[in-house]
């Protein structure tokens, strides 16, 4: 019973989606067609009014800023270089001895098992069955 419900639900949901898309697409295209067919009303243009002239402002003389005297850069006294302390030396660590690589013995290849052949099974025919 549950298999039939899930099978019918899996077939029904794409069908419903296709129907909804078909129903929603029709009014949009009809509305767009109506917009193209309706003539737009003409709006009358208003006459252009002459622009009043703006009065010109009198020109003011540019103010010159007084020049400031140049101030010499103060010379900084040189600081003596501070010697960095030497780092203590550590004795070298002895090198670790190198170990030879271990060779694993090769395992002999095992022969692949042959597939067992299963004899073909034929259904016996019973009297009265097609």
From Swiss-Prot:
Region called Disordered, residue ranges: 71-130
- Segments of this protein annotated with the region 13 X 5 AA tandem repeat of P-[DEGQ]-[AEFLIV]-[QPT]-K: 47-125
Keywords attached to this Swiss-Prot or TrEMBL record, sorted alphabetically, are: Cell wall, Repeat, Secreted, Signal
Q: Which domain of life is it from?
A: Eukaryota
Q: Name one GO cellular component term.
A: extracellular region
Biased composition of type Basic and acidic residues is found at 71-84, 98-117
Signal peptide positions are 1-32
First and last residues of every sequence repeat: 47-51, 52-56, 58-62, 63-67, 69-73, 74-78, 80-84, 91-95, 97-101, 102-106, 108-112, 113-117, 121-125
For whether the record's keyword set contains Zinc, the answer is no
From the Swiss-Prot or TrEMBL record, give the protein name.
Protein PELPK2
Species per Swiss-Prot/TrEMBL record: Arabidopsis thaliana (Mouse-ear cress)
| Gene (name only) | PELPK2
């Amino acid at each position: 019973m549950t298999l039939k419900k899930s099978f019918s639900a899996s077939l029904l949901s794409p069908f419903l989606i296709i129907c909804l898309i078909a129903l929603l697409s029709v009014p949009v295209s009809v509305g767009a067609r109506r917009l193209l067919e309706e003539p737009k009303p003409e709006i009358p243009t208003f006459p252009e009014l002459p622009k009043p002239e703006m009065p010109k402002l009198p020109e003011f003389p540019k103010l010159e800023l007084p020049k400031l005297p140049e101030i010499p850069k103060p010379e900084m006294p040189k600081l003596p270089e501070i010697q960095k302390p030497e780092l203590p030396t550590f004795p070298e660590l002895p090198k670790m001895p190198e170990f030879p690589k271990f060779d694993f013995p090769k395992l002999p290849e095992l022969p692949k098992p042959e597939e067992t052949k299963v004899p073909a099974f034929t259904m016996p025919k019973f009297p009265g069955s097609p």
